[in-house]
Amino acid sequence: MKLTFMGAGSTVFSKNVIGDTMMCDEFHDMEVALYDINAERLEESYLLITKMNESINGGKATVRKYLGVEQRKDALRGADFVVNAIQVGLYDPCTIIDFEVPKKYGLRQTIADTLGIGGIFRGLRTIHVLKDFARDIEEVCPNAWFLN
């Protein structure tokens, strides 16, 4: 079984999702493909996930890292599950702006992932990247479950 984690530079989120997954018997021997476009953040997550694999999973999973758009299809190839955790535009400045613009005009923005003005901004930034992901998934792992 293969799990590809898109946006693996989100270290805390990848640690939580993959760590929880490793706790399930069905996923002990899985292949984990960590994908990100930021080398430093990817390496940070890779070291953490590798350490977790050793400590809570007895090293049973195979953990690989894939950097950049040119390695995206390799990360996805043969995946059974694709977890998406990308943030186009980074927290600073984009997510901060997603909160500041509604506030400036007196609109309450409780969360900017999917709701309100901030959610619209985030969606507009993200949709073109997700379309690229979808094309690659259709080509190299058409039966994968995409979890956003």
PLM regions and their residue ranges:
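N-terminal Rossmann-like dinucleotide-binding module
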Residues: T4-H28
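Short, solvent-exposed beta-strand-terminating loops
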Residues: F81-K103
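A structured beta-alpha segment of the ubiquitous adenosine-cofactor-binding alpha/beta core
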Residues: S55-D80, Q87-L90, Q109-L115, G119, ...
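A short helix->loop->beta-strand "cap" motif at the edges of active sites that frequently abuts
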Residues: R125, E138-W145
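Residues at the starts of beta-strands that form the adenosine-phosphate
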Residues: K2, E31, T62, W145
